[in-house]
């Protein structure tokens, strides 16, 4: 899975998705969609990756190949996003996280332990799942999450849903540069394709949930190791990124918190060569020995 040669963006997405098993679990009046990558025959430890707001499992397109085959990698489309239906309560983080935790248990078993990793809004979900399932979750890692420390500057995005063709693609590039990726050279066709697919399927209003205080409430309840990463150039955190890192370090002195140089908000995509080794290092600390 580590051989991402110069395929077309669609070929990369299709290849990685084809290597997963698709699951559906209950979510409100509908279903939650999951993908599981497993090359171990069910023996490797489980890590669940939670994407960001207005996202899908595709936010982890450069992370999944780095974790398989050492892990069983479980990625949902979070409730109200991607292919998943709306949750019973679309405003309460812990209610949504309960749906997520129940989905994990339905797929890998109620007695299976797992690590959770969340990007942006997914960090709130990861922290809440960790607080709700202290006997099941081995560690919580948050990447570029809001709700920690002082608010950053507001990021204004252009509307795209009414646009078509090249104008739509160009506007996605503008928005990716403003919000997600600091280095314009990293805004490639794959990033734009993922952004387009994700945004047109976004229904859950995640920013309010991320800023609700739920992530800090959950972090205060954690009984497991906490890790964190923020891009030095994370636009939603700007100019408060270092302050967020300092806030979390002060609140959780034993947490492993990293500031990623030259990196924007979507760190796992823009700086995969930096994020993936750090993430593997963090996960290794809680990897089961048998």
Q: Could you describe each region identified by the protein language model?
A:
Residues 35-83:
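Conserved HGGG/HGGXW glycine-rich cap/lid loop of the alpha/beta-hydrolase fold
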Residues 151-152, 167-224:
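Conserved alpha/beta-hydrolase catalytic His-Asp/Glu region
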Residues 230-263:
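Conserved loop-alpha-helix segment in the C-terminal half of the alpha/beta-hydrolase fold
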């Amino acid at each position: 899975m580590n051989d991402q040669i110069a395929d077309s963006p669609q070929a990369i997405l299709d290849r990685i998705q084809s290597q997963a098993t698709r699951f559906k679990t209950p979510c409100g009046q509908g279903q939650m969609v999951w993908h599981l990558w497993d090359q171990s025959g069910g023996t490797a430890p489980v890590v669940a990756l939670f994407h960001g707001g207005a996202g899908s499992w595709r936010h982890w397109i450069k992370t999944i190949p780095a974790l398989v085959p050492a892990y069983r990698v479980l990625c949902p489309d979070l409730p109200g996003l991607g292919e998943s239906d709306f949750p019973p309560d679309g405003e309460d983080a812990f209610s949504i996280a309960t749906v997520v935790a129940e989905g994990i248990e339905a797929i890998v078993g109620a007695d299976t332990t797992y690590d959770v990793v969340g990007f942006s809004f997914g960090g709130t979900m990861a922290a809440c799942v960790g607080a709700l399932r202290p006997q099941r979750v081995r560690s919580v890692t948050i990447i570029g999450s809001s709700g920690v420390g002082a608010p950053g500057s507001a990021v204004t995005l252009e509307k795209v849903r009414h646009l078509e063709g090249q104008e739509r693609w160009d506007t996605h590039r503008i928005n990716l540069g403003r919000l997600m990726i600091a280095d314009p050279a990293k805004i490639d066709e794959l990033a734009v394709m993922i952004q387009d697919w994700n945004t047109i399927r976004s229904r859950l209003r995640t920013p309010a949930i991320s800023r609700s205080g739920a992530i800090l409430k959950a972090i205060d309840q954690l009984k497991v190791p906490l890790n964190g990463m923020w891009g030095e150039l994370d636009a939603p955190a700007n100019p408060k990124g270092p302050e967020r890192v300092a806030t979390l370090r002060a609140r959780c002195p034993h947490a492993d918190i990293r500031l990623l140089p030259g990196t924007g908000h979507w760190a796992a995509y823009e700086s995969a060569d930096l994020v993936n080794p750090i993430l593997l290092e963090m996960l290794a600390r809680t990897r089961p020995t048998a």
